[in-house]
């Protein structure tokens, strides 16, 4: 460690960011961040360039007007409007061309110089200024540019007083570059900070009274980390010099430390500032220490600015502020992992878990109480190391996951901005529709020329047609103020979707209930992008909706509709991007860029159906209806090929039948039945592969309008349990689990043991090996508990939500206050608060816990894993055995009653060992005839019972099916018995 004063630190970094240099007309640079100054009417663009093998940073200012849109409320009696408004076709249900089109009158106004009240009326208020710049100019974050004339950067600013940059002269001053012409990536400068807070050791840290002990900062530039730690201590401290390359500055005034940290950001000049849960903890805590003031952020010689905040609401209703840093890109990486469904394969979103999963690395292990004790004893070296390590990991994660390319691809392709990094897909599509509506064109049928055909996307219309009406109020699309089109004027090809005032209930795709069992040589036949193909085929677009006088909504078949053209463009775009990606044999930079862009094309196209499911269920339901029809037709076609003469002759078989075992939305599992001796084992998989390809070709020969099925997998062994729950060995001899043994509410060790057991069935088709493996692993993990295996392998976890979601309106006569429901998560959090641990979970955090073997219900037994001591506390295996009970019943469903005795023997052996030291939760298992009507077990006798009527939904029940809310279907299993757990006498 290098112990310096703050002035010495500034001197050490004096040349870290060069201020004066030349930029030639051959030098490419990249726009990293833009900020629009509404007061001055100019755009500030922050850019990076590689000059002489070193990263150079600068900014330029461009004079421009930025526009927004607001409704015009003029009566429009005369031919011209005094407000000079423009009339646009409405995007949602506009009507029928050449008959009647609903219009919205819109005033385009300058944001620079407009009043606050005018901006609050804007119809595009869901956009950031950067979005507007992206839509109205060629300056887009992430794009590569080049100056048309050589420039000189002075004090980090490229400017020419004699010829200031202006939007109307953009093409004279700048050249937009195609990334494919470049050989190297220009990366942003990355920074990440983290704070460590003090406490009295009995309560959680509170900004009103507990100081910030230190602020760590890591900066990544030119493939190198710089590490700095700002430390506060009220007394003189000595930190020994060490070989570590961390710069350490000690302050005896906390406010001076905080101010110095934010000043130093200007010195190292990052483009991206990361934190981990900073929106919820670090930034509010810093504000608390500053008596509620927001810190000032400076960059270059630009005016200092405070961060802006905006309310961020998660899908489950949790509400937090998001901080925007104006001149810098600020990303709370914790939120990214929380909202991105693609990251749900990790156990939780703690930084340590993510680092181990993606980086194979972990945090420095330092107990919070130990840290506070060290601080009080002036032993700061380990604290500094811990603090700085927490700053390195988020940057490494960001780079490992190639999130820079993802962030800028969203900007270039969909006019999002860097502040939209954690936006949901709904915002992405709304922003895209807004831009496409204003710039829409179509081919003139008379001349064949492309002509302008603008629409206006009014996001308020989405809320109107998707909101649920109260009693006595209009519902559905009748809330839209649209003139009804006479039935005679509705095109004959239009599709009737349903009643205008219908309160639509969403109906999903077709799912066949499979018969549980083990099957050999099944294959899957899936539709290629089924819902996307349907949307193109039926011309699914909000501009094609027609509200008719007969009380129904119709879907016009205009193939030039905005969404149809978007989907066709995305399909073509993805195909071209994949070709570009695969052709990159030398440039890793271009390979990663094209890969991120093609993935984003796929994600967007696949999400538009879900967008309709939120805002226009009538249209979404019709799409799923067509999907069900296509899947039904495919099943009939496949099974109709049984003993087809051409197939029998081609493959030299006497019999070949096809049975569809399972179907789900856009896929089918097909079992070919043949005489084994007619297809020799040596070449069986190859022959079956050719049969699958022949079936694919025959099925696709009957489909038109772009519908295609593809042979996906020939599964040497398939285990079907129930709908959406199965596993198989794929073409590459890899085991794949879908919906089964994957949920996070199951402890890791049980998932490992169950999967290992099922692998014996998949690899050897041997139940005895399956049960031997299950027994051996379950007993091994029992013996290793608290000794060689981490406690996290045995724990459960639950998301903490307090006060999330909507609140019911108060009546005149207020109802008696409801009893506060204590969930497992809330119970564990209260224990953590009372014990003053280093981490108190907030809304949306998952809390790992175990059950204690003690008197009480499951909630009362729950205890946070962070505080559990295996040497002094006794764990309850009650919940674990309930999960085991579910798994044994699943095996019974698959293998049937004839194997119930072998299953019972294995189950009893495991249960006996786990119950041997239990004092309060001893259980025994019994086989029960399913058809036998029995008296419901008492509260003390049966585990896994349902919650009583009137109780809150239980957080304690395990093994509950994800299909619980689905309609009942005929039982399709092999067993008439099931296992139940009872209290041991």
UniProtKB/Swiss-Prot annotation:
GO biological process per UniProt: DNA-templated DNA replication; viral DNA genome replication; viral genome replication
Domain of life: Viruses
Keyword DNA-binding: yes
Top-tier EC class: transferase
Listed EC numbers: 2.7.7.7
InterPro entries listed in its UniProt record: DNA-dir_DNA_pol_B (IPR006172), DNA-dir_DNA_pol_B_CS (IPR017964), DNA-dir_DNA_pol_B_exonuc (IPR006133), DNA-dir_DNA_pol_B_multi_dom (IPR006134), DNA/RNA_pol_sf (IPR043502), DNA_pol_B_thumb (IPR042087), DNA_pol_palm_dom_sf (IPR023211), DNA_pol_type-B (IPR050240)
Region (Disordered): 936-972
Residue spans of biased composition, Acidic residues class: 954-967
Keywords assigned: DNA replication, DNA-binding, DNA-directed DNA polymerase, Early protein, Nucleotidyltransferase, Transferase, Viral DNA replication
Catalytic activity: DNA(n) + a 2'-deoxyribonucleoside 5'-triphosphate = DNA(n+1) + diphosphate
Record's function text: Replicates the viral genome, host DNA polymerases cannot substitute for the viral enzyme in this process.
Family as reported in the entry's similarity comment: Belongs to the DNA polymerase type-B family.
UniProt protein name: DNA polymerase
Organism: Orgyia pseudotsugata multicapsid polyhedrosis virus
């Amino acid at each position: 460690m290098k112990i310096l004063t703050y002035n010495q630190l500034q001197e050490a970094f004096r040349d870290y960011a060069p201020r004066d240099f030349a930029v030639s007309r051959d030098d490419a640079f990249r726009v990293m961040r833009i900020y629009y100054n509404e007061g001055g009417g100019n755009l500030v663009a922050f850019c990076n360039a590689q000059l002489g093998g070193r990263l150079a940073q600068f900014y330029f200012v461009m004079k421009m007007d930025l526009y927004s849109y607001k409704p015009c409320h003029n009566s429009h009696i005369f031919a011209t409007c005094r407000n000079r408004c423009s009339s646009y076709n409405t995007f949602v249900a506009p009507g029928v061309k050449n008959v009647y089109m609903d219009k919205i009158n819109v005033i385009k106004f300058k944001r620079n110089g407009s009043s606050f009240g005018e901006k609050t009326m804007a119809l595009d208020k869901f956009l950031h200024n950067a979005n507007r710049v992206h839509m109205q100019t060629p300056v887009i974050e992430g794009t590569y540019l080049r100056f048309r004339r050589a420039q000189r950067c002075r004090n980090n600013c490229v400017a020419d007083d004699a010829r200031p940059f202006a939007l109307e002269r953009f093409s004279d001053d700048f050249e937009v570059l195609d990334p494919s012409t470049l050989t190297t990536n220009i990366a942003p400068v990355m920074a990440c900070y983290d704070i460590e807070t003090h406490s009295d050791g009995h309560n959680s840290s509170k900004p009103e009274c507990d100081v910030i002990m230190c602020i760590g900062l890591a900066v990544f530039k030119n493939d190198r980390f710089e590490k700095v730690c700002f430390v506060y201590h009220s007394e003189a401290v000595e930190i020994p010099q060490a070989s570590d390359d961390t710069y350490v500055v000690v302050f005896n005034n906390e406010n001076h430390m905080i101010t110095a940290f934010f000043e130093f950001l200007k010195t190292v000049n990052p483009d991206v500032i990361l934190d981990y849960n900073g929106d919820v903890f670090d930034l509010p805590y810093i504000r608390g220490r500053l008596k509620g003031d927001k810190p000032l952020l400076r960059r270059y010689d630009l005016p200092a600015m405070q961060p802006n905040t905006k309310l961020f609401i998660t899908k489950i209703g949790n509400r937090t502020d998001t901080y925007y840093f104006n001149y810098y890109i600020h990303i709370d990486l914790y939120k990214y992992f929380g909202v991105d469904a693609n990251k749900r394969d990790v156990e939780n979103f703690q930084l340590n878990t993510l680092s181990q999963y993606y980086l194979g690395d972990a945090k420095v292990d330092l107990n919070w109480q130990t840290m506070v004790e060290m601080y009080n004893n002036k032993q700061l070296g380990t604290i500094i190391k811990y603090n700085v390590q927490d700053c390195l990991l988020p940057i490494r994660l960001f780079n490992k996951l190639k999130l820079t390319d993802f962030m800028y691809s969203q900007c270039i392709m969909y006019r999002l901005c860097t502040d939209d990094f954690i936006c949901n897909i709904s915002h992405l599509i709304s922003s895209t529709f807004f831009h496409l509506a204003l710039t829409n064109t179509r081919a003139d049928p008379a001349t064949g020329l492309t002509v302008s055909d603008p629409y206006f996307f009014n996001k308020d219309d989405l809320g109107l047609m998707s909101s649920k009406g109260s009693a006595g109020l209009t519902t559905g699309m009748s809330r839209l103020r649209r003139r009804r089109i006479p039935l005679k004027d509705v095109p004959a090809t239009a599709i009737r979707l349903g009643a205008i005032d219908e309160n639509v209930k969403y109906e999903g795709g077709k799912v066949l209930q499979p018969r549980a069992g083990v099957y050999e040589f099944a294959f899957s036949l899936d539709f290629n992008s089924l819902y996307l193909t349907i949307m193109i085929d039926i011309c699914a677009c909000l501009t094609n909706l027609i509200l008719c006088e007969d009380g129904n909504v119709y879907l016009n078949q205009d193939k030039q509709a905005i969404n149809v053209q978007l989907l066709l463009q995305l399909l073509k775009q993805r195909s071209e991007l994949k070709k570009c990606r695969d052709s990159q044999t030398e440039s890793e930079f271009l390979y990663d860029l094209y890969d991120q862009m093609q993935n984003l094309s796929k994600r967007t196209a696949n999400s538009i159906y879900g967008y309709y499911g939120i805002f226009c269920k009538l249209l979404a339901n019709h799409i799923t209806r067509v999907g069900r029809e296509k899947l039904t037709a495919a099943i009939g076609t496949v099974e109709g090929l049984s003993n087809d003469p051409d197939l029998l002759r081609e493959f030299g078989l006497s019999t070949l039948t096809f049975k569809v075992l399972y179907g789900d939305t856009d896929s089918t599992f097909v079992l070919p039945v043949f005489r084994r001796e007619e297809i020799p084992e040596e070449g069986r998989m190859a022959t079956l592969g050719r049969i699958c390809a022949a079936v694919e070709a025959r099925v696709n020969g009957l489909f038109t309008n772009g519908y295609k099925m593809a042979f996906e997998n020939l599964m040497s062994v398939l285990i079907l349990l129930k709908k959406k729950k199965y596993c198989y060995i794929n073409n590459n001899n890899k085991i794949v689990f879908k919906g089964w043994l994957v949920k996070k509410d199951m402890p890791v060790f049980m998932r490992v043991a169950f999967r290992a057991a099922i692998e014996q069935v998949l690899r050897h088709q041997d139940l005895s090996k399956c049960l031997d493996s299950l027994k051996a692993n379950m007993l091994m993990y029992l013996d290793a508990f608290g000794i060689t295996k981490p406690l996290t392998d045995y724990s459960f976890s639950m998301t903490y939500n307090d006060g999330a979601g909507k609140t019911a309106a108060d009546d005149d006569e207020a109802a008696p206050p409801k009893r506060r429901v204590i969930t497992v998560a809330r119970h564990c959090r209260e224990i953590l608060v009372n014990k003053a641990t280093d981490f108190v979970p907030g809304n949306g955090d998952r809390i790992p816990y175990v059950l204690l073997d003690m008197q009480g219900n499951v909630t009362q037994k729950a205890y946070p894993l962070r505080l559990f001591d295996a040497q002094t506390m006794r764990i309850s295996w009650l919940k674990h055995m309930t999960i085991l009970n579910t798994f044994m019943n699943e095996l019974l469903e698959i293998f049937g009653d004839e194997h119930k005795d072998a299953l019972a023997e294995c189950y009893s052996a495991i249960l006996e060992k786990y119950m041997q030291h239990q004092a309060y939760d001893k259980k025994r298992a019994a086989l029960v005839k399913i058809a036998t009507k029995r008296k419901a077990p008492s509260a003390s006798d049966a585990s896994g019972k349902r919650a009583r009527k009137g109780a809150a939904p239980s957080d304690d029940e395990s093994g509950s099916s994800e299909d619980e809310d689905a309609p009942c279907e005929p039982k399709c299993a092999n067993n008439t018995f099931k296992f139940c757990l009872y209290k041991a006498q």
